[in-house]
Amino acid sequence: MRVSKYLLSTQKETPANAEVVSHQLMLRAGMIRRNASGLYSYLPTGLRVLRKVEAIVREEMNKAGAIEILMPMVQPGDLWVETGRWDQFGPELLRFTDRHNRDFVLGPTHEEVITDLIRKEVSSYKQLPLNLYQIQTKFRDEVRPRFGVMRSREFLMKDAYSFHLTQETLDETYQAMYTAYSNIFSRMGLAFRPVLADTGSIGGSVSHEFHVLAQSGEDLIAYSTGSDYAANIEKAEAPLPTEPRGEATEALRTVDTPNAKTIAELVEQFGVAIEKTIKTLIVKGATEEAPLVALLVRGDHELNEIKADKLELVASPLEFAGEAEIRAAVGAGTGSIGPVNLKMPIIADHSVLVMSDFAAGANEDGKHFFGINWERDLPLVQGADIRNVVEGEATPDGKGTYAFARGIEVGHIFQLGNKYSEAMNATVLDENGKSQIMLMGCYGVGVSRIVAAAIEQNNDERGIVWPEAIAPFTVGILPMNMHKSHRVTDTAEALYKELTEAGFEVLFDDRKERPGVMFADMELLGIPHTVVIGDRNIDTGVYEYKNRRTGEKTEVPFAELVSFLKAQFQQG
């Protein structure tokens, strides 16, 4: 591709409204342009990368036995009513009516459509298992779209759905998708980690996320230092306490704490160790008999809201009680609540139940109890894992301790079970002629999100540093003062022809532009390999080659360049 015939659209300045590196560089490199909040057009450079990502995803899905289809982005609202998600999904689901006053949605996901399709097309167990996928635009009306295509309202996604008669075949397909996803991200040259995950609003039981590792990642990954165990922080299991509860050595006493409304203030003002304090959090209950529930975590721990949401006594989705509700039920504000004499169900994290001589609110404004002990000052309560894990704690497989890394979720696989097939009565006849509800799996890859995640992981102060497999172009040709030298023009044209015929994707900068601008654009675009041609190179018979990732420069004889570049690709 000649730059003179191409829509390059690079920018020198970093856009003021772009918060993360990928958004900044996608705008500066002329990959995308904003049309409205969370809506972007892909310019040629961005589309080339997007298509390469798509191609790898498609090849690996096909290799794993999945079959490609295409479903509509616009979906009948009736299907969402049938599964109950019309009401459950919330305002992210963009709804509208057509001229006949029929309800429709812009699809954020396609479980309803695919289940409706399969219940009409598949009737016998002999047609199963079946794994269908599409690469399609999705729409979620995010309340605050941000980070460019990382969290946009409209995005491109590969979503696959499998249908099964038995758990055994669901397990097999799930493992095949796990392997396919690992192959996808490996082929793209990305550092990634699969982790155990919560199923969220999609539902189901077993679930893994695939994260591209990046310091800017929104998700916190907890992984084992001694094994392959890894989980999203929401899913990571906290270890059970190994030490027994200590003996009571302090008497229960009430302390005036008018200026200590937080754990940090209590620790600072009264010198109590933070691990000897507890936080009491009041949430909405799941029943009329218990409209409020108290959750207890140690002062140095954080409540895991995903775990808390799954507690039987707690209303889902999790909702914290308001100040007025708390004051009406307890007689004190949020900064003075504690479990002693609290008249509501209490669930404590396992670590809280082995505490002794601890401090908590006294359920009276401006007062705390110190020296609280279980079975003396209050009865033991229900225990559960309701906290986030901490670095250095033992992992559940017993093979190491937790360490943390940040990641960007780019893939998610689920075993849905019969959640959607049962709701929509998607059945087949088994070998005995008996009707059976199908089991389902679903498997998503954020195609457009991968582009941004790859940039977050691969960039430097000069721009993007693309892995070769998804770079918009693989080789750049930079002729110095081409329009002043016929020799440079002829040599550059011949090289462009030679490299193109050899199968390289070449960006040939044939503009009448200053060398500094040409170099800056090539580095901003992140082209992995650059070849420089000037009169001096022609005199010596060697090209100047530069590797974008390492910055290393090498002089390569004219006749050896093609073989040299092929060797670089094999190494990459």
UniProtKB/Swiss-Prot annotation:
GO terms for molecular function: aminoacyl-tRNA deacylase activity; ATP binding; proline-tRNA ligase activity. Keywords: Aminoacyl-tRNA synthetase, ATP-binding, Cytoplasm, Ligase, Nucleotide-binding, Protein biosynthesis. Signal peptide: none annotated. Its EC number is 6.1.1.15. It is found in: Cytoplasm. It catalyses: tRNA(Pro) + L-proline + ATP = L-prolyl-tRNA(Pro) + AMP + diphosphate. Homodimer. Belongs to the class-II aminoacyl-tRNA synthetase family. ProS type 1 subfamily. Consists of three domains: the N-terminal catalytic domain, the editing domain and the C-terminal anticodon-binding domain. Catalyzes the attachment of proline to tRNA(Pro) in a two-step reaction: proline is first activated by ATP to form Pro-AMP and then transferred to the acceptor end of tRNA(Pro). As ProRS can inadvertently accommodate and process non-cognate amino acids such as alanine and cysteine, to avoid such errors it has two additional distinct editing activities against alanine. One activity is designated as 'pretransfer' editing and involves the tRNA(Pro)-independent hydrolysis of activated Ala-AMP. This is Proline--tRNA ligase. It comes from Shewanella amazonensis (strain ATCC BAA-1098 / SB2B). The lineage of its organism: Bacteria, Pseudomonadati, Pseudomonadota, Gammaproteobacteria, Alteromonadales.
